[in-house]
Amino acid sequence: MPDILCPTCGAALTLGSRQWLCPKGHCFDVARQGYVNLLPVTQKHSLHPGDTREQVVARRTFLEAGFYEPLAQAVCQAARRYGKNAKAILDAGCGEGYYSAQIARALPRAALYGLDISKDAVRLAAGRYKSGTWICGTAAHLPFPSGSLDLILSMFALTVPEEFHRVLTPGGVYLQVLA
């Protein structure tokens, strides 16, 4: 599993009982739902960035109705084909975790990280899907070391090619779905 980096100083974080800590003393609490907020105020462009709770719940209801199930299956098939040896996967812009959970089932040996700028989305994902590491953060400043992720999934989300390239391992896979 790759390190998760402190958004303040860039040092590796260590998971304590309910906190992520860095050697310089920066501390990030794990919420009771199971996610960590690594989005510093300096990286926010609004008071509540990302989707609202209402938007997230509406999307979850829509996705659970099965309308995008064929798309999810196709993405999982691509992940198994191109990322079958992946050890660490990031769903960048994971939303409420629908696609993250599908990828986790498709590649069960890989460590899954879900990241979204919406605290409401990450809260919902972490509350429902316990198998991943859920992070409130931004794709513009990924909290991972260079060359540490084997597969990045971006489903209808903000893409930052330079940042994705930085964190991908050599030969790593980037799967993107656009509307």
Predicted regions and their residues:
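N-terminal auxiliary segments of SAM/dcSAM-dependent transferases
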Residues: 1-48
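Class I SAM-dependent methyltransferase Rossmann-like catalytic core
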Residues: 45, 50-71
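Conserved class I S-adenosyl-L-methionine
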Residues: 85-95
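Conserved SAM-binding loop of SAM-dependent methyltransferases across substrates and taxa
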Residues: 96-108
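Conserved SAM/SAH-binding beta-strand->alpha-helix loop
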Residues: 116-120
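Conserved SAM-binding strand-loop segment of SAM-dependent methyltransferases
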Residues: 130-142
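A short acidic, Gly/Pro-enriched loop at the edge of an enzyme's catalytic core
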Residues: 140-151
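A short glycine-rich, Lys/Arg-flanked "PGG" loop and its adjoining helix->strand segment in the class I
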Residues: 161-173
